[in-house]
Amino acid sequence: MTMNTPRPRSQPPPPHPPLFKPTTPPPPPLLSTSTSTSPPHDFSFAHYLSSPPPSVQRRGRADMSRTPPLGRVGSDLSHNNYSSKANQHRQTGSSSSSSSKEKDREYKAKSKASSPFFSGLGGSWRSGLSRDEEVKRKAKAKTRGLDVGQWVKKYMASMVEHLLASFSRHGGGEREKREQQRRRPHSFSAHGPSALREQRERWRRRRGQLSSAPASLRASPVNSGHLSVGGSVKVSTSSEESTMEELQSAIEAAIAHCKNSITVAK
């Protein structure tokens, strides 16, 4: 005859599945000691005696439903740790941001305090640079003006020299010609164009100062050379009875000779 051992009732499932498996094994089921020690005729009443009353079972189920599983407890703990760390990080971040803001304010205050000094230095430096540039520009303008003035002076000097040289060439040639004409001998010879030119020039320059000789002296070959002009000419004749007629005839002959020479020159 086999003994029918009472099966323990299975525990109700937890309300929430565990997030992770617990490392500790579950407790063994509660078995009454009366099952092993009770006689065979009392076995039919053993499972009634060993099972707790319904009120106790309901209370145990309520307690189990109230107590969260181990996985939920672990997740709650990890969430609490994460939230605490996040709060701590936020606090540190806010403190660091506040400290950085304070440092920025201090730096701005220092820069504002030192900005007038540096701005004054910068303004003086810029003004010095502008003055140097102005001085350099004025010096360049002066040098350019001097260069232009020197160039104009050189050009004018060269032009004046050129004009003087041209005038001197023309004037020198004329002067030389005049000197040569003055130095040429004058004669009463009625032969050749050179004699006519010389006589014309002589009558132009020495008008009113020429003393002509009588016809006998004018025709003689001895007096055909150079005549001295400027003083009274003494004419020696064979006879001392020279009359006004002879002088008049000589003057008329000289005038006719001059007219002929002028017409030939034209």
From Swiss-Prot:
Residues 77-93 have a biased composition (Polar residues). Keywords: Brassinosteroid signaling pathway, Lipid metabolism. GO terms for cellular component: plasma membrane. Residues 1-144, 167-242 are annotated as: Disordered. Residues 100-109 have a biased composition (Basic and acidic residues). InterPro entries: BKI1/MAKR1/3/4. Residues 9-30 have a biased composition (Pro residues). The keyword Kinase does not apply. One of its GO terms (biological process) is brassinosteroid mediated signaling pathway. One of its GO terms (molecular function) is kinase inhibitor activity. Residues 31-40, 210-221, 229-241 have a biased composition (Low complexity). This is Probable BRI1 kinase inhibitor 1.
